[in-house]
Amino acid sequence: MEKKTRLFGTDGIRGTANQYPMTPDMVVKIGQAIGYLLRKEAEEKSSSVRKVVIGKDTRLSGYMIEQALASGLNSMGVFVQLVGPLPTPGIGYLTRTMRAAAGIVISASHNPFHDNGIKVFGSDGFKISEEMEREIERLVLEEDLTPLLPPSKEIGRTRRIEDSQGRYIVYVKGTFPLEYTLDGMRIVLDTANGASYKVAPSIFQELGAEVIQLGDDPNGTNINDKVGALYPQKLAESVLHYRADVGISLDGDADRVIMVDEKGEIVNGDRILAICALHMKERGLLKGDTLVATQMSNFGLEKRMNEAGIKLVKTGVGDKYVVEEMRKHGYNLGGEQSGHIIFLDHTTTGDGCIAALSVLAVMKQTGKKMSDLNHVFEDVPQILINCRVKRRAELSELAGYNDMIRNIEKKLAGNGRVFVRFSGTEPVIRVLVEGTEKAQITQFAEEIASFLEKELS
């Protein structure tokens, strides 16, 4: 095996369970590396806080990885609190409120069940910095950690926390305006057989909604299996069948959401951002009159924001880059077309339940149906193709690539764009083409995808 120099992608460490780096021995060492850094930090601050909160989604491999992580952390003198299946943002919240030194989520988000991953939050509830990621990688890949283990009497313990779900439910409900309820609203809710299958229905039901559930029967292998935010078609059909007011679809770890209006039309992350940004600006709540999005967002969103006097700032793809930009400049709303929506007034990362409640609050406060809100802007035609590849390469160094892109951009004549990037979480390269003519941009996207599949297979 070639020497690995990186473990972290754009959203933590990911891989196939029981394959590198998601093997028990590697996960133990990852736990030890995190534990060593936390112990070192506590000693430098003369602090006794060496507590880590660990949550997970519903994947079969979550049990194995949970035990391996806890063992590694315990061996470095760190105390572990296991909270079981809970949305990723819930771990960020509990890390802060339980005064833990760190929080860890065991999840591969929207990936299939056979994948799993590790995301790490700092004591402030935000994902750790790239500098800390590099230091964890260095310890895992280059160091023998055995000499760094503390004496036997300083080994940590692990215990389970039983009321974590209730704490998260109360916290999320608290973001909904007190003067409103969801009484009389019928919601179809798809929890992707994932981390939110228990908490999400309770949140909406306790606020008064009638909830019809999909994807609420996890068995360890059916997470994201034709359900959840990547598969909103079934949700749309159910909304029409049950004559619901709205559909809400979460992904496996519930940090993102896609919605459906009462007519069965999909409301993606761009539209959720636009709906909330316009509503917040109207009420003087949008800090800096600015919305943060990514390069994947539709140009129609940018046009609508400009018309409304809202500045749109674009970052690299990945919710952590959106959060970095928001924190750096004090903005309070940002997100991605894929459904990661971040309300920094309430949370430290994308939260599908909070985002959905924010849209429902707009419906209640304006008296508008979801379909009325969904007409917030007109999409510029956009084609996205995900190509599975076997290797990565510097695209500009592939023979013929630059000429192909230049030729396509020339034909678009300033009325569109081409955006190509490797996924940070999957062996996939994403090809995005925007323009005025759908047939033309489809042809261009397929041409680029065919070229890349051939060159990178």
UniProtKB/Swiss-Prot annotation:
This is Phosphoglucosamine mutase. The gene is glmM. Pfam families: PGM_PMM_I, PGM_PMM_II, PGM_PMM_III, PGM_PMM_IV. InterPro entries: A-D-PHexomutase_a/b/a-I, A-D-PHexomutase_a/b/a-I/II/III, A-D-PHexomutase_a/b/a-II, A-D-PHexomutase_a/b/a-III, A-D-PHexomutase_C, A-D-PHexomutase_C_sf, A-D-PHexomutase_CS, Alpha-D-phosphohexomutase_SF. Its cofactor is Mg(2+). The modification Phosphoserine is found at S109. Catalyzes the conversion of glucosamine-6-phosphate to glucosamine-1-phosphate. It comes from the Bacteria. One of its GO terms (molecular function) is phosphomannomutase activity. NCBIfam families: glmM, PRK10887.1. It comes from Bdellovibrio bacteriovorus (strain ATCC 15356 / DSM 50701 / NCIMB 9529 / HD100).
